[in-house]
A protein has these predicted regions:
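Short acidic N-proximal helix/loop "leader" segments that mark the beginning
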Residues: 1-11
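Short, well-ordered beta-strand elements
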Residues: 108-112
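Hydrophobic-ligand binding "helix-grip"
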Residues: 45-46, 56, 60-103, 113-116
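A conserved amphipathic terminal alpha-helix motif
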Residues: 114-142
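Tryptophan-centric aromatic hotspots in well-structured domains and transmembrane helices
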Residues: 27, 83, 130-131
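Solvent-exposed alpha-helix faces
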Residues: 28-29, 135
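Short beta-edge strand/loop motif at the mouth of beta-sheet-based domains
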Residues: 11-12, 18, 29-66, 76
Length: 142
């Protein structure tokens, strides 16, 4: 096992033709109740929108999965989440979503960093999953 096997550092960016405040609201929606899988089915996610707030999947009937906690929320420019996410093994994740007002709209930057005993399949598919999130946010505002 090498250090590369134990770490993940992924960045994705999208420019959205919408006001930064509207983009931030869509980010909160898509990371919470509006979270979907690529096939359109709901993820049943809850995002408590305050520092220390939980970010979790509520499957109903007392079944759920803690994905993380809100580390930083600074509307309309920054959301940081940290925790195990979907990884049910020894790993820690940090998600940083930054928004910058640009000419004609907003630049949304997502950075996902993780370390631990990372599953190779998770590392391979994570870019596709985050692209779905960013595409969904862009679609919300088009």
């Amino acid at each position: 096992m090498t250090i590369e096997d134990l770490v993940l550092d992924l960045e994705q960016h999208v420019e959205i033709k919408a006001d930064i405040g509207d983009v931030f609201k869509s980010v909160l929606h898509r990371f919470g109740e509006g979270s979907t899988q690529p096939d359109g089915s709901t993820m049943n996610m809850i995002l408590e929108q305050w520092p220390g707030g939980r970010w979790f999947r509520d499957r109903g009937n007392g079944v759920g999965h803690l994905w993380g906690h809100v580390q930083v929320i600074k509307a309309p420019v920054l959301l940081e989440l940290s925790g195990p996410m979907f990884m049910s093994y020894p790993a820690i994740n940090h998600i940083e979503i930054k928004l910058d007002q640009i000419a004609g709209g907003t630049k949304l930057s997502l950075r996902h960093r993780a370390m631990g005993l990372l599953d190779a399949g998770h590392k391979q598919g994570i870019g596709t999953g985050w692209k779905h999130y960013l595409d969904s946010i862009q679609k919300d505002l088009s």
